[in-house]
Amino acid sequence: MKKIILTIIDGLGLRKERQGNAYLQAKHPCFDYLFSMCPNSVLQASGQYVGLPEGQIGNSEVGHLNIGAGRVVYTGLSLINKAIENNTFKDNEILNDVIDKTIKNNTTLHVMGLLSNGGVHSLDLHLFEILKLAHSKGLKNVSVHVFGDGRDVKPQSIKNSLETLKDLCQKFGYKISSISGRFYAMDRDSIFSRNQEAYDAILGQSKNVIENIDDYIESQYKKGIFDEFFEPAQLKDGVFVKNGDSIIFFNFRPDRARQLSHMFIGSNLYTYKPKNQVQIDNFVSLMKYEGINSKIAFKEMEVVNPLGKVLESNDIKQLRLAETQKYAHVTFFFDGGVDIEYKNENRILVDSLKVDSFADYPHMSAKEITDSLLNNIEKNDFIIMNYANPDMVGHTGNLNATIEAIEFLDSQFQRILEYVSLNHENVTWFITADHGNAEITEDENNKPATKHTTSPVMFICTDKNVNLGNGSLCDVAPTILDYLKINKPKEMTGKSLLK
């Protein structure tokens, strides 16, 4: 059986327009060769094609879920939205229970999360529905702690959501008590010093005490500090977390919610102990945060027989390879949102640089990823790997840095292509991406665009004897299994794109 390399480029979509398109403005001779000489097609990577609402931008979690599952996976955003649409959100047992207990104990319910309409980690609508539910049940003591986005949405976009939130809080008698940028509140690289600053603001122990949230946002903007990087601050008249209170974390995506959750209720994931630990009565997450013992409001779709399981069942040695920023995506998310290591599975984690902005280091750890691939390909049969550059640098909205990231990625692809060309009888290379981003780094006004896109993505195969049709991310696994002449499991509803 041929060895397979499945490379997932993070955040590189296909778009014809040149303006703001880092890919089209970059020099990429290896990509040019692959597109001109190898079978290739186009895959949909957003909206209903990946289990999201129509028109919703794709993201790394959803992209890897769909690729690994071989079917459309309906994720937290769709599940929660559907509950709101069919009017069952108000009947959610876990949400009602935490509200009832807060009323009974005469304590405070704190609702925290990313205030964004991006729909990648959270959706502002979910916060609003929680507040409406609490008010309908007569809960008077509710405090809201918001995190600025500016990454999956425009850098200065919090105000629209904030206006709606302020109106609801004024109507219901609730408080907005703290604000932090996601850079602090949602770190996922174990840089707990960042989380600690957000945690302090939520506990009312921040060094930054502000009178008015709108004035504070304007003051941050004047300093060139936008939503993602808001310095954590607490409102002078805020209501802060104390012993016996309860928390609802309304982010539905887990990877950037785990560290802050750990600080409130502990876990076996990390050893960090926060300063000024509080005892939380009830801690609720809208979806499951793997490794965090929260009460889960909405249960996710179970993925049976993802690609990794099929490889295990066929005694195929597999390697998962990524740098820190995307390691969870080629493991946890690729395996259907389950933390499992299969028989004959190897894993290599390449450390990501711990920097404030990857615009300053657009190469990231791409060279080390390639080194690891070439050093380990002989020991494995199926390599699932991720390059993070286009997405992580694209999120900065820095066009020149993103161009450099793509050009460096192209040089790494050249190294892989040389190996594959020399060993083409034994190795086939499949290339795709999980969603778009780097192809739109500037908007129509030449301002930085930092969010994901709805662009389709590439699907390339270096075996020139095949023909590829167009499809969606869920078709990648069935296609590769068909190529290997392995029957796909019945649960994989994606189709082979081999013609």
From Swiss-Prot:
Keywords: Glycolysis, Isomerase, Manganese, Metal-binding. Monomer. This is 2,3-bisphosphoglycerate-independent phosphoglycerate mutase. Substrate binds at residues 121, 151-152, 182, 188, 253-256, 326. Pathway: Carbohydrate degradation; glycolysis; pyruvate from D-glyceraldehyde 3-phosphate: step 3/5. GO terms for cellular component: cytosol. GO terms for biological process: glucose catabolic process; glycolytic process. Binds 2 manganese ions per subunit. The keyword Cytoplasm does not apply. Its cofactor is Mn(2+).
